[in-house]
Curated annotation (Swiss-Prot):
Protein name (record): Uncharacterized protein YbxH
Pfam families the UniProt entry points to: DUF5370
Superkingdom per UniProt: Bacteria
Organism expressing this protein natively: Bacillus subtilis (strain 168)
Length: 63
């Protein structure tokens, strides 16, 4: 699962299958902004979950 770019922001997901959790690191023009934490079930987080979290973040921050 690669990075997602939107309007100068980069969203880089990473996750732990063992712990069943992950985070999306948010960067703006290369500078770290914050981390969006999430949980998932199964071998990998669903790509739709990542997209939904990124879309929600962009909506909340008017990106």
């Amino acid at each position: 699962m690669g990075a997602i770019e939107r309007s100068g922001y980069t969203f880089q997901p990473e996750f732990s299958v063992v712990r069943q959790n992950g985070a999306i690191h948010v960067y703006h023009q290369g500078e770290f902004v914050e981390e969006i934490e999430f949980e998932f079930n199964g071998e990998y987080p669903d790509h739709d979950l990542i997209e939904e979290l990124v879309n929600h973040y962009c909506f909340e921050h008017e990106i």
